């Protein structure tokens, strides 16, 4: 416990906040190229095969990004747009791919939550 005089002389050191999305360089999104597309199993108690892509961003950072939605057309060398946002049950996956931008297609035939998955507006009858 510092004395009052020590606090006047030195002050308190502020805690540094860690940046969870350091690879984005303070940008809202970044583009990147897929190095590998694979699946990964989540932590307990969940069970699935979550689709992820290893992406090299335009600033040369290599990251893992989650591919949301059902089905995708990503391959090696596809370009994608990346945003922040972790996947709670996949350790080390702190980014999401944005659907409907660059080489990652939106989900055809999706009617709800279309903006999150880059889906076209359905034709009204």
UniProtKB/Swiss-Prot annotation:
GO terms for molecular function: structural constituent of ribosome. A stretch of 270 kb of the mitochondrial genome is duplicated within the centromere of chromosome 2 resulting in the duplication of the gene. The expression of this duplicated gene (At2g07675) is not demonstrated. It is also probably not RNA edited and therefore differs in all the positions known to be edited. Protein S12 is involved in the translation initiation step. It is found in: Mitochondrion. The keyword Mitochondrion applies. GO terms for cellular component: mitochondrion; ribosome; small ribosomal subunit. Pfam families: Ribosom_S12_S23. The lineage of its organism: Eukaryota, Viridiplantae, Streptophyta, Embryophyta, Tracheophyta. Transmembrane segments: none annotated. Keywords: Mitochondrion, Ribonucleoprotein, Ribosomal protein. Belongs to the universal ribosomal protein uS12 family. CDD domains: Ribosomal_S12 (cd03368). GO terms for biological process: translation. Its main location: mitochondrion. This is Small ribosomal subunit protein uS12m. Component of the mitochondrial ribosome small subunit. The gene is RPS12.
């Amino acid at each position: 416990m510092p004395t009052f005089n020590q606090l006047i002389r030195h002050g308190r050191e502020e805690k540094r906040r860690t940046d969870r999305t350091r690879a984005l360089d303070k940008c809202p999104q970044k583009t990147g190229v897929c190095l590998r597309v694979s699946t990964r199993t989540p932590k307990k108690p969940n069970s699935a095969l979550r689709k992820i892509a290893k992406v090299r961003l335009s600033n040369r950072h290599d990251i893992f990004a989650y591919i949301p939605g059902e089905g995708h057309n990503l391959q090696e060398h596809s370009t994608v747009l990346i945003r922040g946002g972790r996947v709670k049950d996949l350790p080390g996956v702190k980014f999401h791919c944005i659907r409907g931008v660059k080489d990652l297609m939106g989900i055809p035939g999706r009617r709800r939550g279309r903006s999150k998955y880059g889906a076209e507006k359905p034709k009204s009858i």
